């Protein structure tokens, strides 16, 4: 059963409580949305971005950092103290997930930053006018992160942050109907496609089951969920929250993504950020009692 409460009378409170109980690694898990495309309560700000504050048995983890325009503001409004951040996980190297890294490094005391080395590469998108635009992380190396008081953990392979909390590392691209959702490029001339090998997800073994946090799922939603099921040796996934980058997806890809969510018995589904209107509408129509909203200020307790 999923009970949702959103902001009421201007109070900054938006919570989702998951009530089923299954024994797992993390006994107390709370997740707060700090950056998303929509604001969920009076006084909060929105941006095209994604950032989650994760509290796992006392461990404070920031999953992505948004563009950086709303992170500290929303943190203050939501009583999230970024200065006590233990770990930062970057799902990939795009600006709307890494832009707040400077602010976190300035406030926190040497957090561990979990990131794939390719996230520091120059990255470009193609604008509507056909002109290249830079969409990468402004921090261009692990050494630069270290110089700004951050410890760096490179995550090509699955990496455990703390008991029960993992970063997937690189995700194998096995499906023949998924792509990065681009076009994305590694050069300003737009001649070298970016395979986004840096794309990764975080998953948590909670009392309720496996909780999956996505950045944009550029590796493909199906590839990502299948990889996590492989890593946990369990097909069942309790919750999936985050961007799924299906805004330009084909009908086949959307339908097969829906089938994968059913196959993995996902009980709580929070399509957010870059999922896209068509795909989000399809997910809410197919899973009306499993879907939850994820604007800034939303809180989830598992």
Predicted regions and their residues:
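Short, Lys/Arg-enriched N-terminal segments with co-localized hydrophobic residues
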Residues: 6-24
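Conserved beta-strand hairpin/beta-sheet module of binuclear metal-dependent hydrolase folds
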Residues: 29-78, 195, 199-214
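Short, acidic Gly/Pro/Ser/Thr-rich loop/turn segments
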Residues: 38-41, 70, 120-122, 173-177, ...
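Divalent metal-coordination and catalytic microenvironments
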Residues: 54, 75, 92, 164, ...
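Active-site metal-binding motif and surrounding structural segment of the metallo-beta-lactamase
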Residues: 70-121, 230-239
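Cap/insert and terminal regions of metallo-dependent hydrolase folds
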Residues: 94-97, 112, 190, 194-212, ...
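Metallo-beta-lactamase
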Residues: 120-200, 263, 292-302
């Amino acid at each position: 059963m999923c009970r949702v409460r959103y902001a009421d009378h201007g109070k900054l409170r938006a919570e989702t409580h998951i009530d089923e109980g299954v024994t797992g690694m993390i006994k107390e898990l709370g997740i707060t949305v700090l950056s998303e495309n929509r604001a969920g309560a009076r006084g909060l700000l929105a941006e095209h971005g994604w950032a989650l504050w994760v509290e796992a048995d006392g461990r404070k983890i920031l999953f992505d950092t948004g563009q950086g325009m709303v992170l500290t503001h929303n943190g203050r409004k939501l009583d999230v103290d970024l200065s006590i951040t233990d770990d930062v996980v970057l799902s990939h190297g795009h600006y709307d997930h890494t832009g707040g890294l400077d602010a976190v490094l300035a406030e926190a005391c040497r957090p561990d930053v979990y990131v794939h080395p390719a996230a520091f590469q120059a990255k470009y998108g193609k604008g509507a006018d056909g002109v290249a635009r830079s969409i990468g992380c402004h921090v261009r190396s692990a050494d630069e992160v270290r110089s700004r008081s951050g410890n760096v953990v490179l995550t090509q392979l699955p990496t455990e942050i703390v008991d029960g909390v993992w970063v997937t590392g690189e995700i194998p691209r096995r499906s023949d109907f998924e792509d990065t959702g681009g076009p994305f490029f590694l050069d300003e001339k737009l001649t070298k496609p970016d395979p986004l090998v840096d794309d990764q997800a975080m998953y948590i073994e909670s009392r309720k089951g496996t909780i999956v946090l996505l950045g944009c799922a550029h590796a493909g939603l199906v590839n990502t969920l299948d990889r996590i099921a492989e890593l946990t040796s369990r097909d069942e996934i309790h919750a999936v929250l985050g961007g799924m980058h299906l805004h330009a997806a084909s009908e086949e890809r959307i339908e097969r993504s829906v089938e994968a969510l059913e196959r993995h018995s996902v009980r709580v589904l929070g399509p957010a950020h870059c999922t896209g209107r068509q795909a989000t509408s399809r997910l809410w129509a197919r899973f009306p009692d499993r879907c939850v909203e994820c604007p800034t200020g939303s809180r989830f307790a598992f």
